[in-house]
Amino acid sequence: MSKSENLYSAARELIPGGVNSPVRAFTGVGGTPLFIEKADGAYLYDVDGKAYIDYVGSWGPMVLGHNHPAIRNAVIEAAARGLSFGAPTEMEVKMAELVTELVPTMDMVRMVNSGTEATMSAIRLARGFTGRDKIIKFEGCYHGHADCLLVKAGSGALTLGQPNSPGVPADFARHTLTCTYNDLASVRAAFEQYPQEIACIIVEPVAGNMNCIPPQPEFLPGLRALCDEFGALLIIDEVMTGFRVALAGAQDYYGVVPDLTCLGKIIGGGMPVGAFGGRRDVMDALAPTGPVYQAGTLSGNPIAMAAGFACLTEVAQPGIHETLDELTTRLAEGLLDAAQEADIPLVVNHVGGMFGIFFTDAESVNCYQDVMACDVERFKRFFHMMLDEGVYLAPSAFEAGFMSVAHSMDDINNTIDAARRVFAKL
């Protein structure tokens, strides 16, 4: 047995499923998950000593690559001054100044510890601000594991949501309406059925949890217009896309102004950090200035703030996003060419430093239904064959891939060459 196999066997006796987040268990592709010993730049190194070109990037945060010296040094220096104070620090102010400077739609920001905390807090704030209970989310979009968000669509287009996890009360789920991504008609229908009850829409501007689905040109502006028409707030969940699709996020890339924005992943530079913010009048409703309660013992802790500040300072440098786009475009085009040579039907979506690989005969993949029609079994074989080639992709047909500026063009070309060999045998 490999060392990863031995560790996984031991882990399953002590940790549910052997992992601390389900997708890491390789249940979407089968086999034994890799146990990682270290990471540097664009590479992961497992406990058995094998190196992999990494396109998971810790599920998005590692836009600068692993073990970036500026972030590492910032963490070391901050740790020398103390790990957590439970009191305000200067770095929290500096971090808030930087975030609101980089994302102009955020007049104010509140730091939290994860993307889930950011989205659940933003939704609570939207409900408190509007005095309404219902929310709209989209089928196939993931916004963390808060009860109100673990909801699937009912049997009809306008039915109330149903829990998709045991432990979520039906009374919670009924306040969540699930619409179809990239389908404005389904959103209007929900508003027309509940015109005075919907507090907010929450949306991934690029859906990264049904692989990578960009919005149609009219979709995000249409959501903004519907929120304005019916008096709801628009929450854009930029946990994946923030500082990755563009410096000011996908909202800037696509030209839409939200009322609230949720951030995570890159904002922490690899540390557990989330944030939400937006319009000043909405944020003023948050405790202690307003009645909507939100708190956290470790929110804004000095280690996380130092890492996040160092990361965002580097990400804001000229050329970062042009490099991400160039590398991702080259990878997408190369994979398509290699698949075509092997007569394998493939669609590759990409936006900025995000990409998605779909085995499908369809010309495009634009929504959850399109994703579910793809060949998942072929993806599973592709994943394991690429892993054997030393390329680490997301172990699920429903998760986006992530590029970093630490990837070199040689890394990209080597990945394409590996895919060409795999496609020939797939």
Curated annotation (Swiss-Prot):
One of its GO terms (biological process) is protoporphyrinogen IX biosynthetic process. Pfam families: Aminotran_3 (PF00202). The lineage of its organism: Bacteria, Pseudomonadati, Pseudomonadota, Gammaproteobacteria, Enterobacterales. This is Glutamate-1-semialdehyde 2,1-aminomutase. The modification N6-(pyridoxal phosphate)lysine is found at K265. Belongs to the class-III pyridoxal-phosphate-dependent aminotransferase family. HemL subfamily. The gene is hemL. It catalyses: (S)-4-amino-5-oxopentanoate = 5-aminolevulinate. Coiled coil: none annotated.
